C-alpha cells in the first residue's frame, strides 16, 4: 500500500508486511516492507527486496524404500504456490502498469505545472519586476525632485524671512526718522510761529516808528514855520529899526543858530530813521529767509513722510503676498507629500502581495517537487520489487530425482506445516522539526 501525506506533515507511517509459507521441507519465505515518512515535507519510501529461501529440514529417508506420494504432494503444493505467486505477480504487474500510467500522468501534470510556474516566473520577472523597478525609479526621481523643491523653497523662505526682518528694521528706522521729522517739524512750526509773531511785532514797530517819524516831521515843519514866522517878524523889525545895527546882528546870529540846530536835528532824525528802517528791514529779511527755509524744510519732510508711508504700504503688501505664497506652497507641498506617501504605501502593499503570491507559487512548486521526489522514490521501490520478483522467478527448481532418498519411517517424519502465516506491522512515527516525539507499533497476525 502507498501512504502519501501533504507537505509539511509531521506524521510518518511505516507499514511492514511479512508473509511466510511453510510446507514441510520446502519453505519459501517472502518478506516485503514499505516505509513511508514525511519529516519536514519530504517523502521517503523504502522497500526491501524479495527473498526466496529454500530450506531442507532434516528429513530422514531410507535408501531401501521410496514414497513418491510425498514428492507428489510437495510438487502439487509447490505448483499451487507458484500458481498463486504468478497470479499475485500478474496482479502486481497490473497494479504496477496502472501505477506507471498514473506516474506518467502525474509527470505530465508536473511538467505542465512546471511550465506554468516558469511562465509565471517569467511573467512576474518581465512584467512585475520591470514595472516595480520603473515605478520605484519614478518615485525616487519624484522624491529627489520634491527634496530639491523643498530645499529651494526653504532657501527662498529663509531669504524672504531675512528680507522681512530687514524691511521691518528699515520700517522701524523710517518710523523713528518720521517721528524725528515730525518733532523737528513741530519745533520748526513753533519757530515759524515765533517768527510770524516777531514779524508782526516788527511791522507794528515799523508802523509806530513811521507814525512817530511823521509826527516828528510834522512837528519839525511846525517849528520851521514858527521859526520862519519869527525870522520874518525879526526881519520886519530889523527893517524898521535900521538905525539899530546891533539888534540885527544879534537876530542874524540867533537865526543861524536856530538853522544850524534845526539842520542838525533834522539830519540826526533822518539818520536815526534810516538806521532804524535798515535794522527793521534786515530783521524782516532774516525772518523771511528763516520762514522760507522752514517752509522748504517742512515741505521736504512732508514729501519724505509721504514717500516713506507709500514705501511702507508697498512693503506690507509685498510681505503679505509673500506670506500668502509661502502658505500656499507649504499646503501644496504637504498635499503632494501626502499623495506620494499614499502612492508609496499602495505600492508597498502591492509589492507585499506580489511577494506573498511568489512565496505561494514557490511553496506550490516545492510541494510539486516533493510529490515528484516521492513518486520517483516509489517508482524506484517498485522497480526493485520487480527486479526481486524477476530474480526469484528465475531461480532453478530443485531436482527431486537427484535427491538421495533413504528408507524412513513415515511415522517418524515431522508434522508438515500446511498453513500460511501473514504478519502485518503498522508503525506510526510522529515528528516535529526533525525530532521524533511519538512512535507507536501495531502487529496483526493472520492465518491462511
Curated annotation (Swiss-Prot):
Residues 228-250 are annotated as: Linker 12. Keywords: Acetylation, Cell membrane, Coiled coil, Cytoplasm, Cytoskeleton, Glycoprotein, Intermediate filament, Isopeptide bond, Membrane, Nucleus, Phosphoprotein, S-nitrosylation, Ubl conjugation. Residues 114-135 are annotated as: Linker 1. Residues 78-113, 136-227, 285-389 form a coiled coil. The modification N6-acetyllysine is found at residues 102, 111, 121, 150, 170, 205, 217, 276, 355, 427. Residues 251-389 are annotated as: Coil 2. The modification N6-succinyllysine is found at residues 102, 111, 170, 276, 427. The record marks 333 as: Stutter. Glycans are attached at residues 16-17. GO terms for cellular component: axon; cytoplasm; intermediate filament; midbody; nuclear matrix; plasma membrane. Vimentins are class-III intermediate filaments found in various non-epithelial cells, especially mesenchymal cells. Vimentin is attached to the nucleus, endoplasmic reticulum, and mitochondria, either laterally or terminally. Plays a role in cell directional movement, orientation, cell sheet organization and Golgi complex polarization at the cell migration front. Protects SCRIB from proteasomal degradation and facilitates its localization to intermediate filaments in a cell contact-mediated manner. Involved with LARP6 in the stabilization of type I collagen mRNAs for CO1A1 and CO1A2. This is Vimentin. It comes from Cricetulus griseus (Chinese hamster). The lineage of its organism: Eukaryota, Metazoa, Chordata, Craniata, Vertebrata.
Amino acid at each position: 500500500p502507498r501512504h502519501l501525506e501533504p507537505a509539511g506533515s509531521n506524521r510518518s507511517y511505516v507499514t511492514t508486511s511479512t508473509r511466510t509459507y511453510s510446507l514441510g521441507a520446502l519453505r519459501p519465505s517472502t518478506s516485503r516492507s514499505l516505509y513511508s515518512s514525511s519529516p519536514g515535507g519530504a517523502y521517503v519510501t523504502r522497500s526491501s527486496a524479495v527473498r526466496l529461501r529454500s530450506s531442507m529440514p532434516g528429513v530422514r529417508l531410507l535408501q531401501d524404500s521410496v514414497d513418491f506420494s510425498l514428492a507428489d504432494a510437495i510438487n502439487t503444493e509447490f505448483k499451487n504456490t507458484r500458481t498463486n505467486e504468478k497470479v499475485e505477480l500478474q496482479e502486481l504487474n497490473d497494479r504496477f502498469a496502472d501505477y506507471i500510467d498514473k506516474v506518467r500522468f502525474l509527470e505530465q501534470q508536473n511538467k505542465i505545472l512546471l511550465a506554468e510556474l516558469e511562465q509565471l516566473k517569467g511573467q512576474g520577472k518581465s512584467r512585475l519586476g520591470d514595472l516595480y523597478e520603473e515605478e520605484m525609479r519614478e518615485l525616487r526621481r519624484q522624491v529627489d525632485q520634491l527634496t530639491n523643491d523643498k530645499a529651494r523653497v526653504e532657501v527662498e523662505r529663509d531669504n524672504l524671512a531675512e528680507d522681512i526682518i530687514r524691511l521691518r528694521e528699515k520700517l522701524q528706522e523710517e518710523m523713528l526718522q518720521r517721528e524725528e521729522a515730525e518733532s523737528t517739524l513741530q519745533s520748526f512750526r513753533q519757530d515759524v510761529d515765533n517768527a510770524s509773531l516777531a514779524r508782526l511785532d516788527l511791522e507794528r514797530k515799523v508802523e509806530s516808528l513811521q507814525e512817530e517819524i511823521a509826527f516828528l516831521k510834522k512837528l519839525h515843519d511846525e517849528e520851521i514855520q514858527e521859526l520862519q514866522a519869527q525870522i520874518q517878524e525879526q526881519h520886519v523889525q530889523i527893517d524898521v529899526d535900521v538905525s539899530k545895527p546891533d539888534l540885527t546882528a544879534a537876530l542874524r546870529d540867533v537865526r543861524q543858530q536856530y538853522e544850524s540846530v534845526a539842520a542838525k536835528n533834522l539830519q540826526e532824525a533822518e539818520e536815526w530813521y534810516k538806521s532804524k528802517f535798515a535794522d527793521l528791514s534786515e530783521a524782516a529779511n532774516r525772518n523771511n529767509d528763516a520762514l522760507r527755509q522752514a517752509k522748504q524744510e517742512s515741505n521736504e519732510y512732508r514729501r519724505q513722510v509721504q514717500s516713506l508711508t507709500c514705501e511702507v504700504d508697498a512693503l506690507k503688501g509685498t510681505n503679505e503676498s509673500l506670506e500668502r505664497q509661502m502658505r500656499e506652497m507649504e499646503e501644496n507641498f504637504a498635499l503632494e507629500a501626502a499623495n506620494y506617501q499614499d502612492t508609496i504605501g499602495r505600492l508597498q502593499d502591492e509589492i507585499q502581495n506580489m511577494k506573498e503570491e511568489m512565496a505561494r507559487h514557490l511553496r506550490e512548486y516545492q510541494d510539486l517537487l516533493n510529490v515528484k521526489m516521492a513518486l520517483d522514490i516509489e517508482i524506484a521501490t517498485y522497480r526493485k520489487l520487480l527486479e526481486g520478483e524477476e530474480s526469484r522467478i528465475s531461480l532453478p527448481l530443485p531436482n527431486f530425482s537427484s535427491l538421495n532418498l533413504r528408507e524412513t519411517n513415515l511415522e517418524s517424519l515431522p508434522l508438515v506445516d500446511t498453513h500460511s502465516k501473514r504478519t502485518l506491522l503498522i508503525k506510526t512515527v510522529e515528528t516535529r522539526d526533525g525530532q521524533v516525539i511519538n512512535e507507536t507499533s501495531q502487529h496483526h497476525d493472520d492465518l491462511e
